[in-house]
Structure formats: C-alpha cells, structure tokens
C-alpha cells in the first residue's frame, strides 16, 4: 500500500509512527519531530509524526486533554512545513473531519470507536489513509468486518493496528497470533508497542504503564511480521502530560530502532511460512 511517501507492507521495510501522545506545545512538537526525523533517516526507517490535539478518552476530567482543534492543527501544519514529515492525528465522533483531513496526511480512529459504523465510514470518506486501532475488546478476526466498513466507504488505504487486549482489570496483554490473523484483512498491520504496555486507569485518575516492556513487545511483534510500529515517545516521559508511564524515552529511541530494523530485515528476507496456512 502506498502510504505518504513510501510503500507499506510485509514486502517493504518497517515504518515508524511516533511522537508525544498529546500536543503539549509547538516547541516540543518541533523538537521531537526533528529529532525523530533525523534518527529515522540514520536508521533507514520511514517516519510519520503522531500527536493528538484532543484526548477525548482520558481517565478523568482532571487530566490534560490537549490544546484543542484550532491550535493543534496549526502546530501539526507547522511541523509538516518546517520539519518536512507527514503527520498523523486521531479523530473522534464530534471532530470536523474535513477540517482535519485538510491538514494531516493520515487519520487515526481510536480503539474504543472501532465498532462505530457511521464513524468509521465517515473517516474513510475523507480520502486519507486511515489507521484503525483494534478495540481492546475485539478479537483479531473481527477486524475484517471493520475493514469492510471502511472499504465500502470507498477507501482502500486502510491499516489495522493492534494495541493490546483487556486482561482482567487495568491490564492489557498482547497476543502475537493476532498480528498474523489481521494480515488476512489484506491491510498493512501496525503494532502499537506503547499502548500495549499501558495499565488503563491503573493510577485512579490516570493510566499507568510499564515502559520497560516496550522493547520486549516491539521485538516480538517485528519477529512475528508487521508493516509498521507505533510508539509514542517523549523527551522526559515522567513529565509528559498524557500517557507518560507507557511512553518510550526519546533519548533511547534510536538504540531500540536499530535493533528493530535489523530484526525486521532478517525476518522479511526469510519470508513467512505461516502464510501457507493463512489467507495472506
């Protein structure tokens, strides 16, 4: 699949979607995007900058949600123009989709909304590539129905994203079999390595996380075979205004990415023997 300025799929090198969970300031966005662009160029990984103008699903009303639509889009446009990278942001049911699609290169739908038919189809109709996050409550094979909804809206630039499955209270687990199953949709599969270590609502009024396991799950996903990785990052995650506990530290991003790129090259050069049994 053609995605921004590169090809995405198991026949192509892994790509990275990364940035702070939420837009905190213009300067942080520019600094983070610039550093990510440079390190991705050194490693040889295509890059899409990600950050949100509004986090509508925070645990508490006391949690920081973002800078809002107008200021958020202005900053994303500035990142595009000054840093020269494609940008992605998530949208919600009350988002003016046409306004957002006029600025960003990729639209993302939140996991909680993956079953909302009208929403998925309205996003797909904007003519942008869409990254559909699989709900924490959804089986991987059920993503076929979600993808069908998007395609029926006339969009064939669809990605599906795994971000963990609910396992008891305040805990997520990642079933790597689901990555292979979701390939049967015919869409590039993305693994969200940072939200997969989140502990939803684990701190009462905010979510906890175990960022020390981000490399473990990222390596496992790349070894299983994915088109791309989604990893939120921050220069100082402990001071991040949203999802800091599961964000990967920006100073450690290049070191991790080198390992993942090396592993991706080896795995994709060998092919995927399980495809003989799966409809991929």
From Swiss-Prot:
Gene Ontology, cellular component aspect: cytoplasm
Catalytic activity line of the entry: D-arabinose 5-phosphate + phosphoenolpyruvate + H2O = 3-deoxy-alpha-D-manno-2-octulosonate-8-phosphate + phosphate
One Gene Ontology term from the biological process aspect of the record: keto-3-deoxy-D-manno-octulosonic acid biosynthetic process
Subcellular location, principal: cytoplasm
InterPro entries cross-referenced by the UniProt entry: Aldolase_TIM, DAHP1/KDSA, KDO8P_synthase
Annotated localization: Cytoplasm
GO MF term list: 3-deoxy-8-phosphooctulonate synthase activity
EC number(s) stated in the UniProt entry for this protein: 2.5.1.55
Domain of life: Bacteria
Keywords: Cytoplasm, Lipopolysaccharide biosynthesis, Transferase
Pathway given in the UniProt record: Carbohydrate biosynthesis; 3-deoxy-D-manno-octulosonate biosynthesis; 3-deoxy-D-manno-octulosonate from D-ribulose 5-phosphate: step 2/3; Bacterial outer membrane biogenesis; lipopolysaccharide biosynthesis
Pfam family, one: DAHP_synth_1
HAMAP family: KDO8P_synth
Family: Belongs to the KdsA family.
NCBIfam families xrefs: KDO8P_synth (TIGR01362), PRK05198.1 (NF003543)
Protein name: 2-dehydro-3-deoxyphosphooctonate aldolase
Organism of this sequence: Thioalkalivibrio sulfidiphilus (strain HL-EbGR7)
